[in-house]
């Protein structure tokens, strides 16, 4: 599933292409379960004629800011992608949402596995989306002190805590493994047991792993592309994730894969304590 870097890059590459454009109509919606709120009929009606004024990201949601105070929130889930296509481009069978713009271009939401989701939110809906998610790890407010506060008193293992979107928003399996490797912390360590130095190292590890991925265009393991259709290259720079049986780049020990909170988890048994 695309995580914070991939979602940010998808949002940026989509937003810069369509900001200022007006959505004339929803031209295709053949998988109505994609729309979580409002009803599919209301979604189609309310989107028509809305102009795109800006874009953003919250957690793993792509946000398009529309006139009238509405926000179109799109979640790529496992296999979703958003691209801008010429006026005459035909959607394939996996393109379940098509938005026609006033200059004739089309926005395709393609999702072979049909896990992607769309929400059209008013101000209250947007506030609820914000409230459901925790701190943004690349924000100025996410300091070492703030991370220490979030971990204090929590006896859960550190990796599932990092994956909890209500605590820290946007981190998934890839960047949890990469951040913990950078911080030299075992994924099963209780969060409340981390020392002040380890919390600081984890804070640095989280931000460094995410920033590296942004620099490298995100991680493409199978489906991810940005809205220009470009693959990321960050998968070529993993230190722990998806490197089972390979040597640790830091100490040479063999990277192990185990299961933590029902998620495949990669770590170095020597470096990470």
UniProtKB/Swiss-Prot annotation:
Pfam families hit by this protein: Fapy_DNA_glyco, H2TH, zf-FPG_IleRS
Cofactor needs: Zn(2+)
The EC number(s) this enzyme carries: 3.2.2.23, 4.2.99.18
GO biological process, one term: base-excision repair
InterPro entries assigned to the protein according to its UniProt record, in alphabetical order: DNA_glyclase/AP_lyase_DNA-bd, DNA_glyclase_Znf_dom_DNA_BS, Formamido-pyr_DNA_Glyclase, FPG_cat, MutM-like_N-ter, Ribosomal_uS13-like_H2TH, Znf_DNA_glyclase/AP_lyase, Znf_FPG/IleRS
Entry annotated with the keyword Zinc-finger: yes
Keywords, ordered alphabetically: DNA damage, DNA repair, DNA-binding, Glycosidase, Hydrolase, Lyase, Metal-binding, Multifunctional enzyme, Zinc, Zinc-finger
CDD domains in UniProt: EcFpg-like_N
Active site per UniProt: 2 (schiff-base intermediate with dna), 3 (proton donor), 60 (proton donor), 263 (proton donor)
Gene3D superfamilies: 1.10.8.50, MutM-like, N-terminal
First and last residues of each zinc finger (FPG-type): 239-273
Catalytic activities: Hydrolysis of DNA containing ring-opened 7-methylguanine residues, releasing 2,6-diamino-4-hydroxy-5-(N-methyl)formamidopyrimidine; 2'-deoxyribonucleotide-(2'-deoxyribose 5'-phosphate)-2'-deoxyribonucleotide-DNA = a 3'-end 2'-deoxyribonucleotide-(2,3-dehydro-2,3-deoxyribose 5'-phosphate)-DNA + a 5'-end 5'-phospho-2'-deoxyribonucleoside-DNA + H(+)
PROSITE patterns: FPG_CAT (PS51068), ZF_FPG_1 (PS01242), ZF_FPG_2 (PS51066)
One GO MF term attached to the UniProt entry: 8-oxo-7,8-dihydroguanine DNA N-glycosylase activity
Free-text function comment from the UniProt entry: Involved in base excision repair of DNA damaged by oxidation or by mutagenic agents. Acts as a DNA glycosylase that recognizes and removes damaged bases. Has a preference for oxidized purines, such as 7,8-dihydro-8-oxoguanine (8-oxoG). Has AP (apurinic/apyrimidinic) lyase activity and introduces nicks in the DNA strand. Cleaves the DNA backbone by beta-delta elimination to generate a single-strand break at the site of the removed base with both 3'- and 5'-phosphates.
Assembly mode: Monomer.
Family: Belongs to the FPG family.
Cited NCBIfam families: fpg, PRK01103.1
Protein name: Formamidopyrimidine-DNA glycosylase
């Amino acid at each position: 599933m695309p995580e914070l870097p991939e979602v940010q890059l998808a949002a940026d590459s989509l937003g810069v292409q369509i900001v200022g454009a007006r959505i004339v109509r929803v031209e295709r919606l053949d998988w109505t379960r994609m729309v979580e709120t409002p009803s599919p009929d209301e979604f189609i009606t309310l989107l028509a004629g809305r102009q795109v004024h800006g874009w953003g990201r919250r957690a793993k949601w792509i946000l398009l800011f529309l006139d009238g105070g509405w926000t179109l929130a799109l979640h790529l889930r496992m296999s979703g992608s958003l691209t801008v296509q010429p006026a005459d481009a035909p959607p394939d069978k996996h393109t379940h949402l098509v938005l026609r713009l006033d200059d004739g271009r089309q926005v395709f939401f393609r999702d072979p596995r049909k896990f992607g989701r769309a929400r059209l939110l008013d101000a209250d809906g947007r506030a609820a989306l914000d409230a459901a998610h925790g701190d943004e790890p690349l924000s100025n407010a996410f300091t070492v002190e703030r991370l220490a506060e979030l971990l204090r008193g929590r006896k859960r293992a550190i990796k599932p805590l990092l994956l909890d979107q209500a605590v820290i928003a946007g981190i998934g399996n890839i960047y949890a493994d990469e951040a913990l490797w950078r911080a030299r912390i075992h994924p099963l360590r209780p969060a409340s047991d981390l020392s002040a130095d380890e919390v600081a190292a984890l804070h640095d590890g989280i931000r460094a792993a995410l920033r590296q991925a942004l620099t490298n265009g995100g991680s493409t393991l199978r489906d991810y592309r940005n809205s220009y259709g470009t693959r990321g290259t960050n998968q070529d720079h993993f230190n722990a994730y998806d490197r089972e049986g390979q040597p640790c780049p830091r100490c040479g020990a063999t990277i192990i894969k185990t299961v933590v909170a029902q998620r495949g988890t990669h770590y170095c048994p020597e470096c990470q304590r």
